[in-house]
Amino acid sequence: VCVAVARVLLDIIKTLARFLIRRWHLSDEVALFVGTAIVVVLVITLINGVLLRGFLAGASRVFQPQNTATREGVVQPDRPERSGSPESFAAWDSLGYQGRNFVATGPGAEELTRINGRPAKEPIRVYVGLQTADTDEARMALLLSELERSGAFEREVLVIAPTTGTGWINPIASRALELMYNGDTAIVSSQYSHLPSWISFLGDQEKSMASGRMMIDAVQNRWAQLPADRRPRLLLYGESLGSMAGQGAFDWLPDISRMGFSSVLWVGPPNASPLWRGITVRRDPRTPEVEPRYDNGRTVRFSQGNDASQIAADTGVPWEGTRVLFLQHASDPVVWLSPDLLFSRPDWLAEPPGNDRTASMRWYPIVTFWQVAADLMN
């Protein structure tokens, strides 16, 4: 049997090599090497399910201790507006490493009052960890109870913020929002994994999207029950896998406005993100993949901006309805890593380079995929 399988694989390699010679005019040696690499990748893909499950199980055991740790200097909050406080339904010890960081940090009302020069409210931060309850449904029920307890639905803005793989939320983004609204804010999130993002990115994408959909549906359903004149503005934010998790809640763009979101910011969306990919494929003619334009930017826009002025230039034209902004960089491997890189040159490598990508980068079969993948894991 092994001999027969080997012969079949060898025949496939030879057939691929002949195709590569005709298609790309490669030398015999290079074509044979590339053909072998392709077959190896395909064989690995066939057994990937078994290997991936074992890898994820092993990674979970390795990184579980980190999730139970607490960063030096991080202490349990005593403010009732924070999950993990003595008044909270979510126990401090259950929030995970990143959850404890999130609820224990950030500006308080006193600091915001000093910075903005007017009386501020205490920002609300709601978070549930993997250990906060035994099931996804129980975690969502507790999360809604936390929102009610903390008064989150009475704030000016309510931000749903799906996390990255480890449960991380960008502290700069959270702080910026709280500064803008002088603390009249509530940010809500839920942990779905404790694995590093690059591991979750490679093997746990469906879980992130399912978790994002569950949290967004739960919070939005409760928000929609409020009288229209008493609802906070509903915002959505996500970075990297948090962006993919957020996109998992929507089949297409009209669902975002139908659910009542005022604005959406997705930073560094993974290439497999359903909405991002669909919009990019359907972008307006003659607009680049690295910074596409869709429907002339009426409701969705893309920016490579590195600072507020650049982003403002991309978003300064009047919007219509819900605002959706994708912030992405031309050198971000999370955005550009795709299985398609194995065998076809993407538009972003055929176009003039984006703001921070080297112009010397070229596409080569197989090689470019692994180059970008290595950058992702770096």
PLM region spans:
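Soluble catalytic regions of membrane-associated enzymes that act on cell-envelope
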Residues: E72-D255, V264-R277
